[in-house]
Amino acid sequence: MKIALSGKSGCGNTTVSSMIAKHYGLEFINYTFHDIARERNIPFSEFYEKEIIGRDDYYWDRYLDKRLFALSKKNNTVLASRLAIWISKSADLKIYLYAKMEVRAERIMTREGGMYSDVLSSTFNRDENDKKRYLAIYNIDIDDYSSETDLVIDVTNINSNEVFELIRDEIDKRNLKN
């Protein structure tokens, strides 16, 4: 079974994907810019500003997505990334998580700290930068996900356990097996 899960920052992509992987005994694949920054011993904010926003050759996007594309070919996986539903063409189930920006900012603030107004602003800016980059690199509009998904879940008012249950119900309904 192969599952691809996408959504913007603060929607619970990583949390829910890891829950699915653990429950079904699947490999959890989630390689992000945070991981690259950590590997390079650079704070994420500095890496993002200098290496993602500050470059116009999209080197790190291509590096990350090439790695994710190769990993997406493996079986018995849950791939969690902004572009997972577009990258993993052979996924048995493609899921997109959605939440209002204000809720995502609250969740990010809880996870990472900071002042709400700053987190809200940076969340908005990151969304805009992501959209611009993915359009430029791949001609993918990350706000136009409906044709790429089997299941869209608005997570604005539900927690990760409830999201997991909805996904588990869909997996059972489709009779997907590991």
UniProtKB/Swiss-Prot annotation:
Keywords: ATP-binding, Cytoplasm, Kinase, Nucleotide-binding, Transferase
EC number(s) on file: 2.7.4.25
InterPro entries: Cyt_kin_arch, Cytidylate_kinase_dom, P-loop_NTPase
Pfam families for this protein: Cytidylate_kin2
The keyword Cytoplasm is assigned to this record: yes
Catalytic activity annotation: CMP + ATP = CDP + ADP; dCMP + ATP = dCDP + ADP
Keyword Cytoplasm: yes
Enzyme class: transferase
Main location: cytoplasm
Example of a GO MF term: CMP kinase activity
Subcellular location: Cytoplasm
Domain of life of the native organism: Bacteria
UniProt GO BP: pyrimidine nucleotide metabolic process
Chain residues that bind ATP: 7-15
GO CC list: cytoplasm
HAMAP family: Cytidyl_kinase_type2
Family: Belongs to the cytidylate kinase family. Type 2 subfamily.
Protein name: Cytidylate kinase 2
Native source organism of the sequence: Borreliella afzelii (strain PKo)
